Amino acid sequence: MLRRACATMVVALAAPASALAQDGAALYSQQCASCHEGNAAARVPARGVISALPAAQKRAIATFLSTARPVAASASPGPRCEASMFDASASQAPWSAWGVTLANDRFQRNPGITVDETSKLKLKWAFGFEGENAAAAQPTIVGGRVFVGSASGRVYSLGLRDGCVHWTFKADAGVRGAVVVDGTNAYFGDLRATAYSVDAATGELRWKKKVDEHRSARIAGSPVLYNRRLYVPVSSGEEGIGGQATYECCTFRGSVVALDPPTGDQLWKTYMIGETPKPQAKNARGTQMWGPSGAGVWSAPTIDPLTRSLYVGTGDSYSQPAAPTSDAIVALDLESGAIKWVQQTTAGDAFNMACMSADLTNCPEKAGPDHDFGQSPILVTLRDGKRVLVAGQKSAVVYGFDPDNGGKRLWSTTIGRGGELGGIEWGSASDGDNVYVPLSDFTFKDRKALGRGGIDATVGGGLFAIRVSDGMRVWVARPNACADKASCSPALSAPSAVVPGAVLSGSIDGHFRAFSTKDGKVLWDVDTARDFETVNGVNARGGSIDVGGAAIAGGVVLTTSGYPTWGGMRGNVLLAFSVEGR
């Protein structure tokens, strides 16, 4: 279904030419997969992404899609690393999972750089993802190695020192979340809902497991490993497909799946909506509607060993009736998967992509605002021992919940106006005192144009420091203007990361910045939206920074750059920074 959507854009140019299929496969991976096998809300790319392709390339893509012959994509070339043993324990302060800790605080306590040195960060090396137009995966750093996925499904293990290639592995679809490394094992998921375990030293496959059979299911968030269990979040692209008037919307239900790490066997699976979707009314064109549906889990689960709980945020419902567990923070039992409590913050939120198009046929009659929880909850223990579970929503509201009292709401703070691509998108960070929240509020000039009407470069952005104890605003770093840069927005959609004294945050405008945790002052600013000379000789360019955040360990700061979805700037590079580039 995802390929069919791309094919409709170019099928008129297609001709029976089987010789084009292999080139078309590579082009699909490079130009289409990041949208059509990516975010559910990103199934319609900016018009420029397709129109910029030469006619011959459009024909090649159409030929590949019509023949549907599987052709392996090639890995990005690069200097091979010298043979060496991989020792994960050699890292005193690794970044081995999406949120660094089980609490998902994205706080690197021992980064190998001081706050005074952040202004001296310079490019150490750049690695190009050959032929791709997006680079938005979350890197991890363990044992002197970098692990990072890609839109084409290639997973790379690189040398932290110089970007050399230890190994590559080809998944069945794009890999957007973090690669979780534990000892000799590396775990990750792809955008066709398959979880993988590979040898962290060699990349050899140990097992793969399909965690959901729905055709739109995917693993967009990162898995989490704890106490001999691998917890996998499941979301979907059905919110996008559901916008088509001829599609029977919708039957997907978000879930968390617990797997046995040595074998991949399923231990339990808990749907965020307990009720199986049933036929509802037909739409105006006679297409059968289904519900309840949705409540995808878009981000890494948060582990609470004290209460033996797992916390996740859920997305909206796709159809009516809207579920009471959508747009909510949900606590599950670690052992059984049983739901302990639910705190819903936006009721009645039934939304799909029809609600942002000219054809409203499949848009729920009482359409909601699309206020997902896209980020992982952050479990913070304050200096007095009190615990607060913090989560930001696409409504632009940051919440503090009491994890020790059924998730009771402690406070809420509004930082923006929110919306389908607004509010708080992919993640925040906390140093235990404050939570550092990037604001998106990404806006189109024409909301109904689905990214084709141009970006409003005057709206969005800002980094907010919120005191965890009471939700009070400590400071705000106002967004920088885009000026006349094309495909630019000041929105901060990517997750932040924090080290002692500094917060790192990437922007849709391509800038990667460090802010003082004291007052929000900009300590360092680099524009990644440019061409880079890469260690692997690949033509590479940076662009918008979105979805994935920074990883910091061993004195090195990593970020991916390039995200053309919704009209942002394309790019295909992984960047490593260190003090003076050493």
Residue ranges: model-predicted function:
Residues 1-3:
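N-terminal secretory signal peptides that target proteins for export/translocation
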Residues 6-16:
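Bacterial N-terminal signal peptides
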Residues 15-27, 77-85:
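Electrostatic cytochrome c docking/interface patches
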Residues 29-39, 61:
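The canonical Cys-X-X-Cys-His
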Residues 41-51:
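Flexible linker/context regions in extracytoplasmic redox proteins
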Residues 51-76:
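C-terminal capping alpha-helices of c-type cytochrome domains
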Residues 79-124, 272, 276-277:
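Blade/loop signatures of beta-propeller domains
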Residues 115-130, 154-175, 180-188, 193-217, ...:
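Extracytoplasmic/lumenal domain signature
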